[in-house]
Amino acid sequence: MDQRRVFPWLEPSSGVLTQRAPHVTVIVPVRDESSNVAACVRSLLRQRYPNSRLAVLVVDDESTDGTALIVQSLAEEHAALKLLRTPPLPRGITGKSHACWLGAQSVPADTEWLCFIDADVRADQRLLGSAVQAAVDERLDLLSLAPRHDLRSFAERLILPCGLFTLAFTRQASDGGDVTVSGPFLLIRRRAYEAVGGHAAVGSAIAEDVALARILKQHGFKVELRSGDRLLSARMYTGWTTVWPGLAKNLVDTLGGPASALITAFIAIPLAWAAYSIPALDALGCLDRGESTACFALAPALAASAAAIGLHLAGAAHFRIPLWYALLFPLGYSAGALMVLDSVRRRLYGRVRWKGRAYP
């Protein structure tokens, strides 16, 4: 699989944007992000983008850990930074969509592009300039960038590479029929955002990023996902206690609905384990019992197994994690499949819980 074909890379722009660059407002929705928000905001304030054409708006969604105080302190030092506190969350809308929608209603009047960025993102100085230049040049209405993932814990390193491979394969299999975006970075033309009703139109969606991209595409707007590996990084989770609920809350939407998610899960498990089990069974049949069919099948089985391991070795190198994690990929897909089952269960029979809130 050619990663650049599935997720084309956005290379850093070498051009210099002038004071005639489009006005961009970056909206950062936050809820209990005291450990992340300062580093995120500082990286945004260091952008190589004309100061008069850039604003940063942090929307605090009823944080209880001092997040708003940190942002307020930074805002006193930087005129481009503003803090907006949300009122109590109304029924029928998720906290993130509520924060994003209120933020979009509070941007400067001359804002041409809205850029929604998660608090766990760290931005290279060239991020906004490169993204805006690409969006303008290619006449995009939504440009989403997948960040370079900072994987530190065992759970992150085991599961996230397998999950991203699965997402890439499902995107390739759909042949562009469905839309895929990466929630940590969404650059949206303001005119297009307002034309479809923005986050208010997808307020009840758990995976609001995917829902918004779909509605934009349905209305004829141009949506594109790129790899932003050289322009932004993110550590979305910190271990099992955040990986499981964080992924389970939106896997159903990300994989195209309950039926599609279940099919993906039930295909992934046998395929992953087949890389080890089939060569082992063929070797046993050939060497122990002398079965000619098993001996004939052993070489292609070993070749297929080597290809699967090689793919995940390349993935481990890409994610900058120890290569031995590549040998554990059947465990990663199995854990991911269990998360899919949990995601479907939550969606059909229970409530999705995230950051102290429950959504029907």
Regions found by a protein language model. Give the residues of each.
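Cell-envelope/extracellular polymer assembly enzymes that use nucleotide-activated donors
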Residues: 22-25, 55
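Donor nucleotide-sugar binding loop of glycosyltransferases
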Residues: 33-36, 63, 124
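Short, acidic, metal-binding catalytic loop of nucleotide-sugar glycosyltransferases
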Residues: 42-53
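Catalytic donor/gating beta->alpha subdomain of glycosyltransferases that bind UDP-sugars
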Residues: 135-166, 191-194, 199-261, 359
